[in-house]
């Protein structure tokens, strides 16, 4: 029971409650609209210039934005299944619990590579076979990671074009990994457990169809594009590349953060340079679906190609941007002289 003298107070309170409910309803609607907008708007960063197109995000999703037959060459080094942890992101293919889980995730990307790569052109994949650890699986051995990648590309009707082996110093590998099979004490105890070092590979896959734009090299003028003399070609044609400088890489340390669990090393610039030289023309577009800190794109721009690079991890993507910009600026400076 409210006295007549308090009726106006009650009326005022009820009006304020009504206005408050109305305001909360409008705020709720506004919040819902904003959430919908956020879902529609791409939350990732893009950088587009005349020389490169950089995308931050999951390569499987972002690659769908690349037009059909847009790339003249694809070069990348995928996450090495469960061997390394590159970031703490759920979409990171390095964050898998086993080999088969990586295979499942990677299988979604290969159709996008096939769609975006021009007919008759090359996709070069850097990889290595993976050590099987006794603590995980109860025995020591090797997993045929390169063979798995080959089989997956063949399933998408790529042509297995070639493979080259990148020689690695087994002493360096032994010092870095302390692998039982490389230790000298192993041959004293039981040599059956000793093994050779694990090299890197570059697997070359050719897309179906005819290449409509030939890549024609010449050996008469080193100042002209596509200069490839016979002595250099003999190095390229070797099934083992002995002369790759493993220390010639882009700086990466500032791209690491507290969530990185293991050592990560970017792809050697020598390897990238050789692949780009052999399988693309100046002015063509080179794609990397695991852009990292931008090694493939940096070298592409330096060699007067265009780059399309996708990277998930923000700290790597920031370095990717910087390295692409540096390459573009260096080219501009050189063109002045």
Task: Please annotate each region the language model reported.
Residues 1-9, 16:
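Conserved RecA-like P-loop NTPase helicase motor core
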Residues 14, 19-319:
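Core catalytic lobe of class I
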Residues 315-337:
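Cysteine-dependent PTP/DSP-like catalytic domain, specifically the C-terminal lobe
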